[in-house]
Amino acid sequence: MISFFLCERGIFCFSGLFCGRMKGMKSYNSLNDYYRKLFGEKTFKVPIDAGFDCPNRDGTVAHGGCTFCTVSGSGDAIVAPDAPIREQFYKEIDFMHRKWPDVRKYLVYFQNFTNTHEKLEVIRERYEQAINEPGVVGLNIGTRPDCLPDETIAYLADLSERMHVTVELGLQTTYEETSDLINRAHSYELYVETVQRVRKLAPKAEIVSHLINGLPGETHDMMLENVRRCVTDNDIQGIKLHLLHLMTNTRMQRDYHEGRLQLLSQEEYVSIVCDQLEIIPEHIVIHRITGDAPRDMLIGPMWSLNKWEVLNAIETEMRRRGSKQGCKAKEQRFVC
């Protein structure tokens, strides 16, 4: 049956498949828009190095860490990573206020390495050094599915009664062969099970899945399948789409120099991301569709340094297609 409906952008859509956009509006559910609705104003996400490690670095499950990861564990942009946690917080917001002097609400973001890879008393002591500061309205935690025991999730549930809590759960790929190749040292099955436990034990906490486009051996179709599995198998509230940045002093650097890794072109990346956005249900918040890397550490792709050019290229392609997030999304099948 042919049907028309008025979508949330005020556009009449044909069976939900024609996804035209109004000029000047993003074609996806952006994090900035979400936070403005949630908190009523622009809100800073304040990255902090809390001194945790990773289980695939310290020998708990493996050694060496993920092959794409630098020695800072994705915390290369943190202003003062060696300072005490509270001092880091204020140095970060002082730095951000140079560009946005009027922002007064903050989300503490324990970003690099695995920020639940410790005993609960250690986790609690480190978190509490930052989350009680004036203006803090939420907590974002970067972690892995093998580092969330029930007692830690229960603590996050308690925190979610006080503030907005987001568990940023690293996945990177749903393919076991890729996961082994990059030394993730956990399975996709464990990821799905962990998402289910977090949803059950800490229902107010939001879950954001991290995926990387451009991992060794993964094709366009495989990257699309990563997203499809992620959003249909898991009750998640957000997703981060990263471009693989090849960095100096990483194990993946060797793969590249030995010809086992082909970096994506900007055109390939834009095409992949637009295809992915179309199959992500529109209620899922897009926390990232590209990323940042320090120029002095980046081997490639060098085009990724022009972040706004990449963002504009994605938006331009979505507009050319007459498309928007979720226009090709399938029914979700996760178990609540």
Predicted regions and their residues:
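Hydrophobic faces of well-ordered beta-strands that scaffold small-molecule active sites
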Residues: 46-48, 106-108, 139-141, 165-169, ...
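Structural recognition of alpha->loop->beta junctions
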Residues: 66, 130-136, 225-240, 311, ...
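Conserved non-cysteine loop/helix-boundary elements of the Radical SAM core domain that shape
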Residues: 76-83, 112-125, 139-202, 213-234, ...
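A structural motif corresponding to the C-terminal end of an alpha-helix
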Residues: 133-136, 197-207, 233-234, 272-285
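N-terminal [4Fe-4S]-dependent radical SAM core
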Residues: 22-85, 90-107
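Auxiliary Fe-S-binding modules of radical SAM enzymes
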Residues: 23-33, 42-44, 238, 245-336
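A contiguous, low-structure linker/loop signature
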Residues: 91-133, 138
